[in-house]
Amino acid sequence: MFFIHKLFPAKLIRRYKRFLADVKREDQHIFTVSVPNTGSMLGLTTPNSNIWLSYHNNPKRRYAYQLEIVEANNTLVGINTTLPNKLALEAIQNNLLPELNGYKTILKEQRYGIQSRIDFLLRDDILPDCYLEIKNVHFIRQKGLAEFPDTETKRGTRHLEELIKIVQQGKRAVMLYIIQREDCSAFTICRDLDPTYGRKFDLALESGVEFYAIKCQVSVEGIFPIQQVKIENRK
């Protein structure tokens, strides 16, 4: 996925109120940008970090610049949480998830469960319906090991509960973790930051929910899914 807008380098001063960050451009001009990420962004908000911004010439936007990439541990990390669904679709189309081959139709944002929407619903005349939920991942503490979540996520736990119900109905349920960084070879659940999610993950796995993780190559030109990484169920 290539960026539609050219990215501009800057330095991070601080992130605050979740959706905002103060940044400093190369000419030392300081201004506020929007942050398309509702999560904690743990490990990605260090002051003076190298960052990259997209510019949007839209008078309806309050902030013309938007944070897209943060450099952490000499690695470019995508932080825009509106992108993982696009990256997941690209991964499927590029055969990075052969486990999902054979489906004729891919529907987006379909209602299911109790007031929930599934990111993708895959359908076929022969194969069982496949409900595909996408999660964004950026967090790494141990070299080469990506983790999710980076904070408590009641919404994420609820999604696992819904996927368990899908399997109980005789359909396929899949959770796909999109890792917006390249410096990892494995993925695991971050149980110490959200034990409840960890327990629900175990139950979902035992119930037949399928789990996959794909890492991405991140550059100032774009973000591209490149390969699956193994999931380690560490307890």
Swiss-Prot record:
This is Sugar fermentation stimulation protein homolog. It comes from the Bacteria. InterPro entries: SfsA, SfsA_C, SfsA_N. It holds the Pfam family SfsA. The gene is sfsA. GO terms for molecular function: DNA binding. It comes from Bartonella henselae (strain ATCC 49882 / DSM 28221 / CCUG 30454 / Houston 1). Belongs to the SfsA family.
